[in-house]
């Protein structure tokens, strides 16, 4: 995974699961991924060592990955987004219905709650 895709992924995971992290981990990850601050800048602004920043980033990323592995919200959102993009270009009604059924499957297999 290249750097840009990694940043995009962790920005998304942070927006989904950020509240489940410790305040310190969340703050450091936001500074690193959202504001593109260097490890040195983060260390200086938080009065901690570079090693502490690197450790917080590493542990925070691991936690975000664990949350995603367990809950799959990012994956499901990505699948739904791809299906919706596909649906926008469909001209055939039966193909559109098929895509809508795929979206329903993703929603029903996940933790999404749908009020009917």
Give short role names for the model-derived ranges.
Residues 2-17:
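Short, Lys/Arg-enriched N-terminal segment that forms or immediately precedes the first helix
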Residues 23-35:
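Short amphipathic alpha helix immediately N-terminal
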Residues 28, 42-43, 53:
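Hydrophobic positions on the alpha-helical face of helix-turn-helix-like DNA-binding modules
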Residues 38-40:
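Helix-turn-helix DNA-binding elements, focusing on the entry/boundary residues of the two helices
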Residues 49-50:
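Helix-turn-helix DNA-binding motif, specifically the short coil turn and the N-cap/start of the second
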Residues 56-59:
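Residues within the DNA-recognition helix of helix-turn-helix
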Residues 61-68:
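C-terminal flanking helix
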Residues 82-116:
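Helix-turn-helix/homeodomain-like alpha-helical modules used for DNA recognition
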């Amino acid at each position: 995974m290249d750097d840009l895709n990694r940043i995009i992924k962790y920005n998304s995971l942070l927006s989904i699961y950020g509240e489940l992290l410790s305040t310190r981990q969340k703050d450091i990850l936001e500074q690193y991924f959202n504001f593109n601050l260097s490890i040195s800048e983060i260390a200086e602004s938080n009065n901690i060592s570079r090693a502490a920043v690197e450790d917080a980033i590493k542990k925070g990323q691991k936690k975000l990955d664990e949350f995603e592995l367990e809950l799959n919200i990012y994956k499901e959102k990505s699948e739904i987004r791809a299906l919706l993009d596909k649906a926008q270009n469909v001209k055939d009604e039966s193909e559109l219905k098929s895509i809508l059924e795929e979206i329903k499957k993703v929603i029903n297999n996940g933790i999404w709650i749908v009020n009917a």
